[in-house]
């Protein structure tokens, strides 16, 4: 670019010298005071600047300077930014004056030498200041404190010339000579800019430590990094280590987007992966953006961001991308002006072809002008679009970082009004929408500029008839407004409906296991379909309204042209073909702002709504930093001190959660907290973490803390990473922690040990394993204070004892520990026991001290003694009941036989598994590679009505194109070239035919638009139903191995693309192809030689498109793949915010979020760059085609071609480059968007579970009547690549008996239950219930006949009624009866809305114990013959456990009850006990017989439990 600029400058200098020679004979003194000399001097000076910049650039390239030779300067330096702004302003001002001079030429000819010299001077000024601006921008990160010597010298000369210009203006004013106002303004502005630039370049002090080596920092373009190593490291996501080539590209590479070529070349050689995509530059990375954005949101007094307003948010976003926004405004202005050059010159071109020539070589000058305008239009549009997308990426990244940061600090009260789905929507919807607003940010002022330029051209050609054009334009805009308003309302309602659907979908996906166990999945699918139906109602209104707007868009030029030409006839203004063609070309350009204005207004409103939502979210209260006074370790002799504290989750409530709390914990103390369900135990721990708002009192914590939550929070990722939790690996300590938490054996069983990847929410781990991993996480932190919220409830008795001994009394013997527990046996070891009741500490002291001092503690002890009495009675009666066990001997013998048989079988299995390939259960998201299969396109096109509408859509567009070309052809042919030529038809005939053709074309476009949205709507609906039906029918293994973020991404982002974008993408391709064929047809009518150029140009375009699409397609896929981890990380962070804060890990998680955010932004950034790389090349090719046609037209003799038809060809040719680029762009965009269909079809073909109902083999209505479960040689594995979990189990559960299943965590207990419900299908063997093989009947026939109380109590958002009876099968009386039986009736009656009392997301407004009682209520309603309890009482106290056991014994006495429990008291009174170990039966007999054998594992377990519990009363 510099080379071209310099050559132009030299040639212009020669021309200027030739003019000066003709002028020099004038009186020298008079000559020096003439404006002509000033413009000549200015042009010469700017030529010198271009030469200096060019030779500096060449010198740098030859020397290979790295560019960074001096220390960096603060990038916020006022002088640098202002210098950049001044350079841009001067370039823009020169452009405006050059344009004015240029248009003057065509009015008055080339005879005025002063005008010519002035115009050339302005041209050189525009180019030189523009190049200087680019150089300044390229070195914005590495500029020196002073400009290079040559540049400073040049600026001094420029200042002198500017002063001289003002002196000349003053002298001319004194002589009463006329000074053009625009030149006077230019001289004043230039002088002010020169003074400032001179100050910045010459007088500003150099604050660097270097000696000012004479280098050219403006041209170095070196890459620099700001922020230190940490920020750089943070920015490096999983990918190429090098920074973006964009930051290191030279000027020519920047202009042509050649910096994208290496990546596109890699994409052609191999399938692109994220590792191939270079890093973002610091200015585009969230690492660099977030601090600046945060500082802009800070209050002026440095306070919290509680005062965030919409205006402050807008201001912060603006300053985050201030430079890019200004540059895009500059390019938008240049593009708008350049796009109107063609229409302005068409009349002159037609007159030239008609023989009316004003000077020699006028035709070639016109061709050069057309070509130059096209080049400027192309360059400005490409860089405008690219930088707009950069702005969008920056805004989105900054907002996501701030939303995430707010989510980490939100108070629990603030969270209550917002579900996690809504908070995630701020990131996935609102932040994206604000980022997309960058496309529309310049439209408001551009509309005024475009309409102004159009009216100016129309006035030059048609005089006062341009007023009619203005009126028609305003009418069309006004017609668009009501449709725009409706579109806005429809979209708002559509988004609300989508939010509701996504919220419900998210909840269902989280709880899919319980839905399948209960047989409710199809009921909840119908709920999703109902929500989608509501969404489809608004979608239909939206798309049909879009069809009307599309009709207005395509019909607008017709209406405006009919009005304008009609006004010409009424006013008697002669219609000449050149003027008409100029007007038609102007109308076509005016079409865009007319169409975009409603969209722009709608987008502004939507963005305002999103900004308001985000501002209100950022204004929510954070956690109070002063709830807990945090003291450094060793600064106090008290570890925890709580004095007269009253705390409440709801500060406005009259009944605080915790009241008058007082206690002290000294270093090394063990404090136990106990109490009934809902007494405030967990709230007490939360208050020490600073989570519960404080009403009064004081809390002090001295030292670091670690927290173990009641509900395990496990991150997706490796087990090792979950335990280390940001700490460096210390192998010795790590091994000790694993041993203390009994994790070593579990890791040995897992194929990948501690490198096993945990699924979402620890889906592939048992409850006990999750609990022990989070205990290990806490231990590894080596904190001073440990807070354990019921850590032993989810593990078996043996493991619980081991944990208590090795963890609390072992590794933590010297630490302060506060632990909540329901197990009384763990209380005596405590130094202090706090008994909670109704939010108060009712008793406090050591075990023996408070044993007889109050009733609350005695109630807990009494419940425990009652449970222990059951164990003792079974043990005592074991001998007397031998004779009653004869009927069980067969079962015992079977079990023994199985054990013998399994010894050899285990060996076989081990060998088999060692050969089988094993993979992680959670795999990287599968993405298609290579080009999108044609089958995907075909399926999309034919899904709606078998593709029957497609031919009619194409026919409508073809007819529209023919009628539109016909109407323009008619106007060109039927109007004279000039006033002295007779018109071939009457004016009335002219308008009647034109109106008829225009009306016909409008009807065709209305037909096409309506059919297109109809087909698109139908296809979107079909794809939605197909995908969701397949997902809900897929086996549980699919959900275990597929993070919900991947499904959510398809249900939201991909579905939105199918709903709203794909129909228009397909339509755009068809429309553009037909338009392009029409243009080629028109141009070939004038010049068949166009084909000689057009054929190779088309071939080159197709080659470029194929070369580009390989990389672009994979980049687009990577965008989709990289979005899911960002959403998933966000979702996990919100659910685990308390744990993250308790470990003080906020910074690390923010860093991870930034890394994932940049990982998502990188492929988006390069997708934008690749698109502009392609469009630039296609624009150049089509511009060459257009110029070839023009050269041909001006080269042939006058009269050979009808000037009117030639003008028509030029009119259509003006849009050739736009259409050709648009065609390739839409093709590429279509292939990128069709990936959404590909991804949806990917999940629409997921293998389904076996049938829900098999009509030919349905069990009897009374089945199962006895409830006998027979298991034969059962083998189970979770996936073909996973090891066996159950390895040949054979046993029988007799009908009507209670069977307890025990075993270490991970022994296969829960797997056995899942197999009974066919959540997991057996690899071998069978299960029979009352003689019916469950594999031969439908899933719903099986699952709806069984009942289960799951390990994790689940409640859905809705009401108490909908949670107890989701299938709506029972009356209110039956529901109340069930609630009373499970002891929840009184609690629900207290609520104002009774059965319609609200249940929040995940049932968070009900305690864990209450949720478990709701699950008990469900099975009481269902009354199945077989009931399974999967560790159902793990989260409740002993008294509540006893209550549940009593209820079950009372109401399920004749049923088969299968109980998995960690509490011995829950299974000791069972009729049979099955003990599993590593997937095989270790023991299976009656509790009495097993207790007789003191060497049995069960006997040892009971003995340990009894001795441990009995010690509580010693």
Curated annotation (Swiss-Prot):
Record membrane topology: Multi-pass membrane protein
UniProt binding sites for ATP 2: 1303-1310
A cellular component annotation (GO) from this entry: plasmodesma
Amino acids binding ATP 1: 675-682
Enzyme class: translocase
Reaction it catalyzes: ATP + H2O + xenobioticSide 1 = ADP + phosphate + xenobioticSide 2
Entry's Gene Ontology molecular function annotations: ABC-type glutathione S-conjugate transporter activity; ABC-type xenobiotic transporter activity; ATP binding; ATP hydrolysis activity; ATPase-coupled transmembrane transporter activity; chlorophyll catabolite transmembrane transporter activity
Tissue specificity comment: Ubiquitous.
Disulfide cysteine pairs (residue numbers): none
InterPro entries the UniProt entry points to: AAA+_ATPase, ABC1_TM_dom, ABC1_TM_sf, ABC_transporter-like_ATP-bd, ABC_transporter-like_CS, ABC_transporter_C-like, ABCC_6TM_D1, ABCC_6TM_D2
Transmembrane segments: 35-55, 83-103, 116-136, 153-173, 183-203, 325-345, 364-386, 439-459, 463-483, 551-571, 940-960, 987-1007, 1077-1097, 1181-1201, 1205-1225
Induction: By 1-chloro-2,4-dinitrobenzene (CDNB), primisulfuron (PS), aminotriazole, benoxacor, oxabetrinil and IRL 1803, and, to a lower extent, by cloquintocet, fenchlorazol and fluorazol.
Domain ABC transporter: 640-863, 1271-1503
Function: Pump for glutathione S-conjugates. Mediates the transport of glutathione conjugates such as chlorodinitrobenzene-GS (DNB-GS), and of chlorophyll catabolites such as Bn-NCC-1. Also transports heavy metals such as cadmium (Cd).
Protein family per UniProt: Belongs to the ABC transporter superfamily. ABCC family. Conjugate transporter (TC 3.A.1.208) subfamily.
Protein name: ABC transporter C family member 3
Natural source organism: Arabidopsis thaliana (Mouse-ear cress)
Gene: ABCC3
